[in-house]
Amino acid sequence: KCSPSGAICSGFGPPEQCCSGACVPHPILRIFVCQ
């Protein structure tokens, strides 16, 4: 099961956790989100 775009993800986790395969830093909030 993968996370959709915009879902919070771990910046240190495997990129496969996101459906897009990319976990990127949020521009405002200090979190990582799926691209």
Curated annotation (Swiss-Prot):
Organism for this UniProt entry: Spinacia oleracea
Protein name as annotated: Trypsin inhibitor 1
InterPro entries: Tryp_inh
GO molecular function: serine-type endopeptidase inhibitor activity
Keywords from the named record: Disulfide bond, Knottin, Protease inhibitor, Serine protease inhibitor
Function: Trypsin inhibitor.
A Pfam family assignment: Tryp_inh
Site (Reactive bond for trypsin): 30-31
Disulphides: 2-19, 9-23, 18-34
Family that this chain belongs to: Belongs to the Mirabilis serine proteinase inhibitor family.
Notes on the domains: The presence of a 'disulfide through disulfide knot' structurally defines this protein as a knottin.
